[in-house]
From Swiss-Prot:
Name listed for the protein in its UniProt record: Mitochondrial uncoupling protein 4C
Alphabetized InterPro entries for the sequence: Mit_carrier, Mito_Metabolite_Transporter, Mitochondrial_sb/sol_carrier, Mt_carrier_dom_sf
GO molecular function: transmembrane transporter activity
Taxonomic lineage of the native organism: Eukaryota, Metazoa, Ecdysozoa, Arthropoda, Hexapoda
Cross-referenced PANTHER family: MITOCHONDRIAL DICARBOXYLATE CARRIER-RELATED (PTHR45618)
Organism of provenance: Drosophila melanogaster
Keyword Isomerase appears in the UniProt entry: no
Segments crossing the lipid bilayer: 40-57, 100-118, 138-157, 204-223, 244-264, 304-323
Membrane topology: Multi-pass membrane protein
Entry keywords, A to Z: Membrane, Mitochondrion, Mitochondrion inner membrane, Repeat, Transmembrane, Transmembrane helix, Transport
GO cellular component: mitochondrial inner membrane
Family annotation (PROSITE patterns): SOLCAR
Similarity comment: Belongs to the mitochondrial carrier (TC 2.A.29) family.
Encoding gene per record: Ucp4C
Cited function: Mitochondrial protein that is likely to be responsible for thermogenic respiration. Likely to function in mitochondrial uncoupling i.e. creating mitochondrial proton leaks across the inner mitochondrial membrane and can therefore dissipate the mitochondrial proton gradient and convert the energy of substrate oxidation into heat instead of ATP. Involved in cold tolerance, it is required for development to the adult stage at low temperatures.
């Protein structure tokens, strides 16, 4: 051992801990086209399995957010989650709870699958081993990668979000005596394009992308961070308990982060337009926030938080357990 090594021996472990090695040598599943395709299919299957169980909660949440406008005009009390569900079943029938499900399935093929695949691609360069041979991903890197992945995926899936919201609110419009606006997913696309052209397909893309960024950060990024944290602090091994706890944390985080943007997105997408395709109620997202806070109060931005959590909590658990189980059956390591 030379003099330099003797003088600075106490700093060697710190240097190994902080200095990442590229490319990571401990990633069990290499980044190949096959693995990316498997992940894409797995997330699509997992998303639809989870969505089939919790979709009625999403419909009720959207109804609550949109009905706030009607309550504001008539002076009536804001509808509760329970009252919304009960009224939908009593007046429109059980099938109203799955209004827009076809658009959601199509959206899952683009949004849910793509955001997870993009996150996996984006995070790979930032994974490294520490001195204990543990795979490490900095928290801010995970959050940044998930934020970016959510934005890109939602920008592509936005037209399906517009159709989904319109299909979910159609029953309420008919109940109030308005003309029929949506009969099917294809007809909804045609009608939106006919009224506003291609730009109308991306109406509300700003708040929609912001919500997707926050939700993906809370869902995908938080799930990844939670798994690594619980492994280290609680000494949990890869398996059902670790996946369940991590997905619960992810669902709660996603709900808290995404609800305000979700309210704005629903109001922007559901508002009518004039013959030239111009919005009639809100000029843009900031105008929507300003009017909501001034006319309905700050808490309106969290209207539907509980049904959002009731939906995203179970969705996150079912989604991640399904994806992880499919990966396990395919002989891959945990996400």
């Amino acid at each position: 051992m030379d003099k330099a090594e003797r003088d600075y021996w106490h700093l060697r472990s710190l240097e190994i801990e902080e200095e990442p090695r590229f490319p990571p040598t401990n990633v069990a599943d290499p980044l190949t086209a096959r693995n990316l395709f498997q992940l894409y299919v797995n997330t699509f299957i997992g998303a639809n399995l989870a969505e089939s169980c919790v979709f009625p909660l999403d419909v009720a949440k959207t109804r609550m957010q949109v009905d706030g406008e009607q309550a504001k005009k008539t002076g009536k009390a804001m509808p509760t989650f329970r009252a919304t569900l009960t009224n939908m079943i009593r007046v429109e029938g059980f099938k109203s709870l799955y209004a827009g499900f076809s658009a959601m399935v199509t959206r899952n093929f683009i949004f849910n699958s793509l955001r997870v695949v993009l996150y996996d691609v984006f995070r790979r360069p930032f994974l490294y081993q520490n001195e204990r041979n543990e795979e490490v991903l900095k928290i801010y890197m995970a959050l940044g990668c998930s934020f970016t992945a959510g934005c890109i995926a939602q920008a592509l899936a936005n037209p399906f979000d517009i159709v989904k919201v319109r299909m979910q609110t159609e029953g309420r419009r008919r109940q109030l005596g308005y003309d029929v606006r949506v009969n099917s997913m294809v007809q909804a696309f045609v009608d939106i394009y006919r009224r506003g052209g291609l730009p109308s397909m991306w109406k509300g893309v700003g708040p929609s992308c912001m919500r997707a960024c926050l939700m993906t950060t809370g869902d995908v990024g938080s799930y990844d961070i939670s798994k690594r944290t619980f492994k280290r602090l609680l000494d949990l091994e890869e398996g059902l308990p670790l996946r369940f706890v991590s997905s619960m944390c992810a669902g709660l985080t996603a709900s808290v982060l995404s609800t305000p943007a979700d309210v704005i997105k629903s109001r922007m997408m559901n508002q009518p337009v004039d013959e030239s395709g111009k919005n009639l109620y809100y000029k843009n997202s900031l105008d929507c926030v300003r009017k909501l806070v001034r006319e309905e109060g700050v808490l309106t931005l969290y209207k539907g938080l509980m049904p959002t959590w009731f939906r995203l909590g179970p969705f996150s658990v079912l989604f991640w357990l399904s994806v992880e189980q499919l990966r396990q059956w395919e002989g891959q390591s945990g996400f």
